[in-house]
Amino acid sequence: MLSRRLITGPILILILLLVVWWDDWLGPVAFGETQLAPGIALLGICMVVAALAVLELCTIAEATGRSTSPMLTIFAVEVLLIGLWGGSAETNTGVVLLVIVATWFASLWQHACGQRTKGVLNDAAATTAITLYVGGCLGFFLLLRHDVSAWWIAAVVLITKSCDIGAYFTGCSLGRHKLIPWVSPGKTVEGLIGGLALAAGVAVLASCLLASYGYKDISWPMAIVLGVLLGLAGQAGDLSMSLIKRDAEVKDCSDTIPGMGGVMDVLDSLLLAAPVAWLCFR
């Protein structure tokens, strides 16, 4: 498992860096007199990842006895992402509310058209929750792109994931006290501390590196705070997904990514880190 992760991890990082480089190189794309919002490459990768994540979550929901609509959910998530990417501060709230309300009623009426009434409340709630979980959280990366460069988006991802790496290796070597064993038996308090320390260090390194290239500069104390907050958010996101998987009695969301499980197994920590990063840079 570890050997596969050591191969898959660098490949995923390379893909991330290529997307970020492309996004930064493109900048705000213009069509005639119309200038699109920055982050069009980021939007593209978010839409692909979101679709895969929705399929996994819908499968997990099915395992818990809920009947979801994958195509409806994917459509709603993509509309939400596009709306947040191209919207403004004045319209974003309306976009989110409109998509959530539309998804809720569309799910209800999909059941009605299929002449199904049993479990309709739980099924519609699951469809709407997945839409908000994936689309709403990923959308914060697109909102963050309005305020910072694409390279800071990459930094947020790497800082968050560095906490996962630090927690894993520290926990394996020094872990003694279980963190929340009924949710994730492998996580330890010592691992969390080690992960947060590494995340803080990576945040300081990233802030210094990006500042040297003329990107948004933050002080090293703020970088430490950012690293700790992203690390905590990432671990909370990981544990949240573990809770959902325990309900469905599955270990991994799928086997899409060798050595790491499914898309949601990689994405889980980032989904909660995204809104935290957006708040930190406001």
Q: Whereabouts are the PLM-identified features?
A:
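Juxtamembrane boundary at the C-terminal end of a transmembrane helix
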Residues: 278-282
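Hydrophobic alpha-helical transmembrane segments in multi-pass membrane proteins
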Residues: 195, 199-203, 234, 270-277
